[in-house]
């Protein structure tokens, strides 16, 4: 199954986090062309602005007309948003070896098995919210296209899974204009000849559809309809390496947690392509809240990591009276140097 994590109205949401006075107000983040103060386009808008009719891609002059004296207009700060994106991508990368960053505010991961893994999706959502303040929506499906459509259905701040068993019926009832990659113009052209739903293509000659879409997009639609579409998640180079294990029962008993902590350490070091300068112990609590403690040093050898991790675990338990559901270790600031001497 493929999971898409989509950061809800990302640019505007970052602005809300950094200026709480914006919360509840229509917020519009725009790209200014520099020609004049009304020239440019809307990069994104929050849901309050969307309720006014201000949407992404709208010419700025039109958005200013709609939002006059009602909306807050801000210039895009992409480098600032990228810092938030990097933090979120690092969190997501811990949940799969196969991860594809689709854009600054979207990432796909390939999750093992054919079930929806709603628990993992909730965990990812909670970690991102707790560690960055950002709300995300998550879509899950058998391929990237279905995962993306599911994510759209999950917005705002939700989770939607189209299981393998539900895929056939879902595809049979999906509208052409809801399919990623087709676009408004081509959807309109297909609608005009009677193709409103994906299932309608079976009633038309393939060459007729090719005359509208071209060969590549026509093949894409047929593969999707016949449930034969596949596009692999393209992995990226990871910055962090971690392993998380679910405990047999929720507990605060260190003796019961330590064996799983050690397994997490061993697995994380096996994945890491070098020596970490930072180690974090991450505890997912019984209510799915996430608590973590970190240690940074010049070079953290595997033999030393267990004592460091135990100290971090003790800090978590002494400072929090909740039971722990899952325990994990995250290694970061990896040096690919071959020897410890290179650190000094």
Swiss-Prot record:
Mg(2+) binds at residues 6, 105. This is DNA polymerase IV. Residues 2-183 form the UmuC domain. Signal peptide: none annotated. Its EC number is 2.7.7.7. It comes from the Archaea. Belongs to the DNA polymerase type-Y family. One of its GO terms (molecular function) is DNA-directed DNA polymerase activity. Monomer. Keywords: Cytoplasm, DNA damage, DNA repair, DNA replication, DNA-binding, DNA-directed DNA polymerase, Magnesium, Metal-binding, Mutator protein, Nucleotidyltransferase, Transferase. It comes from Picrophilus torridus (strain ATCC 700027 / DSM 9790 / JCM 10055 / NBRC 100828 / KAW 2/3).
């Amino acid at each position: 199954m493929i999971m898409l994590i989509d950061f809800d109205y990302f640019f505007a949401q970052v602005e809300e986090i950094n200026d709480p006075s914006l919360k509840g107000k229509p917020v519009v983040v725009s790209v200014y062309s520099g020609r004049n103060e009304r020239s440019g386009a809307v990069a994104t808008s929050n849901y309050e602005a969307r309720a006014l009719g201000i949407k992404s891609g709208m010419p700025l002059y039109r958005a200013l007309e709609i939002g006059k004296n009602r909306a807050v207009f801000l210039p895009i700060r992409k480098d600032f948003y990228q810092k938030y994106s990097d933090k979120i991508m690092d969190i997501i990368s811990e949940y799969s070896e196969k991860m594809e960053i689709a854009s600054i505010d979207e990432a796909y991961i390939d999750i093992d098995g054919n079930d929806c893994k709603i628990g993992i999706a909730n965990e990812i959502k909670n970690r991102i919210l707790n560690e960055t303040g950002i709300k995300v929506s998550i879509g899950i499906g058998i391929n990237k296209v279905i995962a993306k459509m599911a994510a759209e259905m999950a917005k705002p701040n939700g989770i939607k899974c189209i299981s393998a068993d539900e895929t056939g019926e879902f595809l049979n009832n999906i509208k052409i204009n809801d399919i990623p990659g087709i676009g408004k113009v081509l959807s309109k052209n297909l609608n005009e000849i009677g193709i409103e739903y994906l299932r309608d293509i079976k009633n038309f000659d393939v060459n007729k559809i090719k005359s509208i879409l071209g060969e590549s997009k026509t093949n894409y639609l047929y593969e999707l309809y016949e449930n034969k579409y596949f596009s692999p998640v393209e992995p990226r180079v990871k910055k962090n390496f971690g392993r998380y294990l679910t405990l047999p029962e929720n507990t605060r008993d260190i003796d019961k947690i330590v064996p799983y902590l050690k397994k997490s350490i061993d697995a994380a070091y096996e994945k890491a392509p070098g020596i970490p300068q930072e180690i974090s112990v991450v505890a997912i609590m019984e209510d799915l809240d996430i608590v973590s403690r970190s240690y940074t040093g010049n070079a953290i050898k595997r033999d030393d990591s267990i004592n460091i991790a135990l100290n971090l675990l003790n800090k978590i338990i002494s400072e929090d009276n909740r039971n722990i559901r899952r325990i994990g270790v995250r290694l970061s600031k990896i040096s690919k140097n071959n020897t410890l001497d290179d650190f000094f």
